[in-house]
Regions:
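Histidine-centered phosphotransfer motif of kinases
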Residues: 132, 136-144
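Helix-capping/helix-break motifs at membrane-protein junctions
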Residues: 139, 189-190
């Protein structure tokens, strides 16, 4: 059973990684056509549609924690398990649900609203370089919000195998950032982006490092409790 769990998780992780191919094509080929005036800038062309492969990657990683696999002692499925310390489990789940809500609706809404100022009509060719709002803190706030939201969801469900493979999802998102930078931002904004990159961290500022430390603490505590009750 554990072997099957690993296989299913790895297969989905590979599928999500392969979704980078249309994403790469969208920026590599699509932007070349933009530069040669051979492609309209509307959101209806096939290259813009390929951009949405990034959303399928995200969905796959929301599905993976639900699959059958070993789980941490504290998780939402064991909320009413009498063998689990109820008070700690309730508090654990409340905290993670709050974190999901924050990164999905508070952080996410701010970033999306800010992002749409430049990408509403054309995803592959932003109308301007966004450097204010959340983008003043880090250059990739949308990616960071997505990563922390997925991590919260994985921990809420106590999905151990998905957590072990989470590094793959991080690598996928770093690849997405590299693709966007190389074929879009660095092409259209050049000096402006170079100056922006000098003064703004790509992924982590002090606030996000505090979140990362908090998540690490949660993982360590839950790992300890899980091994304690084996």
């Amino acid at each position: 059973m554990i072997c099957f769990s690993w296989v299913s998780q790895i297969i989905l992780a590979i599928i999500s990684f392969l979704w980078l191919i249309p994403y790469y094509i969208a920026f590599k080929v699509g932007n070349h056509k933009y530069m040669s005036n051979a492609l309209d800038l509307s959101c209806n062309n096939r290259y813009t549609l390929m951009y949405y492969s990034g959303f399928f990657i995200s969905i796959v990683w929301y599905i993976m924690p639900f699959l059958n696999q070993p789980r941490f002692k504290l998780n939402i499925f064991s909320l009413f398990d009498t063998k689990v310390i109820i008070l700690e489990n309730v508090l654990y789940n409340i905290i993670l649900i709050a974190l999901i809500g924050y990164f999905m609706f508070v952080w996410g809404t701010k970033v999306v609203n800010c992002n749409l100022q430049a990408t509403k009509d054309r995803f592959l060719h932003p109308s301007k370089l966004i450097t204010d709002g959340p983008y003043k803190k880090v250059r990739n706030p949308m990616i960071m919000g997505d990563l922390f939201c997925h991590l919260s969801f994985i921990l809420l469900l106590g999905a151990i195998h998905t957590l072990c493979l989470y590094i793959i999802y991080i690598c996928i998102n770093i690849t997405i950032v590299h693709i966007e930078n190389k074929y879009s931002l660095r092409v259209y904004f050049k000096k402006e982006y170079k100056e922006y990159a000098k003064n703004t961290p790509a992924y982590m500022n002090q606030e996000l490092w505090l979140f990362a430390i908090f998540y690490f603490t949660i993982i360590v505590i839950n790992t300890y409790l899980t091994t304690l009750y084996i």
